[in-house]
């Protein structure tokens, strides 16, 4: 009997542990410091458009750019020439230089109209140097643009689906310069947590030290864990691959409510709880009605004139908001039921959540984005 009770108690404890923590790989919780993408940008011209390019009278930089490009190719445009081009558009080209990118590697580029071009569909991007923040050229972009939108116009009417003023070129740029990296220099590497958490940083450090020896990992702060690595490059890759595949028991995160003030969206995680409180909510509406009355003479021979008068009316309406009790809720489903019982719109719900937080009834961090 005692043995059965002990087994049952052990199963209950294991169930509680699995519900409050989950095993995740270190690679899903962290990133390697210094291993990141770098932004590239360039200015270029798109040609071959079917009459949907820039209006050069309104975008003089397009004509200037074309003249400069032609002069570099040995073609001189007479000064004062008014080039009316409809198949050329000035664009900005952006790309991401991947970590450990090598010369000759292809990367995707995004092409966006800079002027007033109607569409970039069917256009070809001419050779465009892509520079980094240090003003050095790291890649060259060129190729046919793929535009995901579609549109048509006739007789003054037009129809457009999605965006026509931007597109992508898959593998449209070639890396010409490699970015130097400091990966694993001096036998030290830092892992950066995706979210700052002192306990998680300590857990990651303890897990690595248990498998690779004491002193291998050291938590520096709530977001950084420092690793002591081999100095050989091949051994560093093997060591980091091993560390990233280690699993860590991750406790349940902080209770959090995210409110988007622009769209009215409200998102909660499963740890949000409510204390008992009473809520009253009501809307105040101001209605302005402007009625137009036309007065005309009864007979055309009376010599009167038609008079237009306006009768404005202003009314204020306030909806009654009785106090409603919100019961304490210990789970996300109960929180949803309690808030839905108020019958509040998303905009009202944002104000209610703020008031609940101020009153200490919302046991969660409220973030407004």
Curated annotation (Swiss-Prot):
Give the matching InterPro entries.
Flag_FlgI
Domain of life, source organism: Bacteria
* Keyword Signal included in the entry's annotation: yes
Its annotated function is as follows:
Assembles around the rod to form the L-ring and probably protects the motor/basal body from shearing forces during rotation.
Q: Which GO terms describe its molecular function?
A: structural molecule activity
Give the record's family classification: Belongs to the FlgI family.
Which Pfam families does the entry link to?
FlgI (PF02119)
**Which named protein is this?**
Flagellar P-ring protein
Question: Which cellular component terms (GO) are annotated to the entry?
Answer: bacterial-type flagellum basal body, distal rod, P ring; outer membrane-bounded periplasmic space
**Subunit comment for this entry?**
The basal body constitutes a major portion of the flagellar organelle and consists of four rings (L,P,S, and M) mounted on a central rod.
Gene Ontology biological process: bacterial-type flagellum-dependent cell motility
**Keywords on record:** Bacterial flagellum, Periplasm, Signal
Localization:
Periplasm; Bacterial flagellum basal body
Annotated signal sequence range: 1-23
Which organism does this record belong to?
Answer: Photorhabdus laumondii subsp. laumondii (strain DSM 15139 / CIP 105565 / TT01) (Photorhabdus luminescens subsp. laumondii)
List the NCBIfam families hit by this protein, alphabetically: PRK05303.1
